[in-house]
């Protein structure tokens, strides 16, 4: 059918090309051959042209007008006779469909900086259509090398938190600092703390007390019954004591005491003191003088003592300075209604080791101390052992008692770094017990940190 149509269409052209029969037949044949030569190049011709142009990508071939070169609209038009000009037949994205062409043209799409003279390289890429396309340096680098940019290789480097500064070597091995961290909110995470770990403190205490050549003075005075230095000024009888507080506290608790055991071995590291501390003592400079209004409900407080007892009513905190045996702030609620009991919140005895006159670590000087808190109310506290390494027969029991007393005094010190009544006035609703994981095989400490609610 097509052949018939072609035959019917061709003779008028031949007749127009040869209008007069007087012309030579050869001229008519040449005209007819030139008409048939306007065709698409064969695949063999395209391959030969591609091989010839591959060595010189920037060469320009000017074809005669009677030879039609396939353009972009003619490429990839049909596959096995089916029209694939639509986008749904193309396996490539829309922006890459226009860059499919002959092999020679695809190879010509390289950076012209490779053939440019030595000097400043040009980041110019010639596309299939012959247009110059400027590329970004990252694209040029990725295009030249098949590897990604070196800055993207390797794992991401996250900023490391600042490491805790090492305590000075002149201080004793066990150094503690304030663990009272006011939180801005319940849901916010804690900032990275530079405080020494409780594990490292206990480990150093254990190593210092269990060393075969350890000095007796290193472990003897871990807890000595003595009035607090917060009331009596610097104590000259404790040369190792780096925590001598002489600053005046607010009127609610002028004579706020430390525990019954002032701890010469537990020192306050200078690197971890708050901004309000001075070298001569504790200066509470940054704390507000006017407390916020107290909450109407009764206050739940947690005591740091190791024996159960009934707390005093909040009315005894009316500005009188008296000495108390433990660092618990449960009797400093300024004008809170009613009395409350804290017996169910008392922690278990430290390691459940009780110092009795029949034990190996008994010291008559560290007998039970009875301290008068108010008329008619007395609290009996078992004093921690004072001289625990003199004349030992069973060393393991004594080391256990030393660690127990040191942990107890450590908790007292943490509770008494800030005035308790200021803590309750600032924080309002009490304390939250934070259970530290099991420190040693025979220890389990509960450090109480005040938090906002």
Curated annotation (Swiss-Prot):
Residue intervals passing through the bilayer: none
Pfam family, one: FAM222A
Domain of life: Eukaryota
Protein family per UniProt: Belongs to the FAM222 family.
Protein name: Protein FAM222A
Organism: Mus musculus (Mouse)
């Amino acid at each position: 059918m097509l052949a018939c149509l072609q035959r019917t269409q061709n003779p008028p052209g031949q007749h127009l090309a040869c209008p007069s029969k007087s012309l030579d037949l050869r001229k008519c044949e040449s005209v007819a051959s030139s008409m048939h030569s306007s065709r698409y190049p064969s695949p063999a011709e395209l391959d030969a042209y591609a091989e010839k142009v591959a060595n010189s990508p920037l060469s320009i071939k000017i074809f005669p007008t009677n030879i039609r070169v396939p353009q972009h609209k003619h490429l990839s038009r049909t596959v096995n006779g089916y029209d694939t000009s639509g986008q749904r037949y193309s396996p490539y994205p829309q922006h890459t469909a226009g860059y499919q062409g002959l092999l020679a043209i695809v190879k010509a799409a390289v950076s012209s900086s490779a053939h440019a003279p030595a000097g400043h390289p040009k980041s110019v890429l010639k596309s299939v259509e012959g247009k110059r396309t400027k590329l970004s340096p990252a694209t040029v680098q990725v295009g030249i090398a098949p590897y990604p940019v070196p800055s993207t290789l390797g794992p991401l480097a996250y900023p490391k938190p600042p490491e805790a500064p090492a305590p000075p070597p002149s201080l004793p091995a066990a150094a503690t600092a304030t663990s009272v961290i006011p939180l801005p909110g319940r849901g916010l995470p804690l900032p990275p703390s530079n405080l020494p770990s409780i594990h490292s403190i206990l480990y150093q205490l254990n190593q210092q007390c269990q060393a075969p050549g350890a000095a007796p003075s290193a472990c003897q005075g871990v807890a000595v019954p003595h009035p607090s230095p917060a009331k009596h000024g610097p104590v000259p009888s404790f040369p190792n004591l780096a925590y001598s507080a002489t600053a005046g506290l607010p009127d609610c608790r002028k004579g706020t005491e430390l525990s019954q055991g002032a701890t010469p071995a537990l020192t306050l590291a200078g690197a971890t003191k708050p901004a309000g501390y001075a070298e001569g003592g504790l200066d509470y400079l940054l704390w507000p003088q006017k407390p916020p209004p107290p909450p109407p409900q009764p206050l739940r407080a947690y005591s740091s003592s190791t024996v159960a007892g009934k707390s005093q009513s909040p009315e005894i905190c009316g500005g009188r300075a008296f000495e108390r045996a433990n660092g618990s702030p449960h009797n400093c609620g300024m004008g809170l209604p009613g009395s409350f009991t804290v017996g169910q919140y008392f922690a278990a005895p430290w390691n459940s080791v009780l110092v009795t006159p029949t034990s190996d670590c008994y010291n008559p000087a560290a007998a039970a101390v009875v301290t008068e808190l108010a008329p008619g109310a007395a609290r009996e506290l078992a004093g921690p052992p004072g001289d625990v390494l003199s004349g030992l027969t069973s060393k393991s029991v004594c080391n256990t008692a030393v660690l127990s007393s040191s942990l107890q005094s450590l908790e007292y010190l943490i509770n008494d770094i800030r005035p308790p009544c200021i803590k309750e006035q600032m924080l309002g609703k009490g304390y939250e017990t934070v259970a530290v994981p099991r420190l040693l095989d025979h220890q389990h400490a509960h450090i109480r940190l005040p938090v906002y609610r």
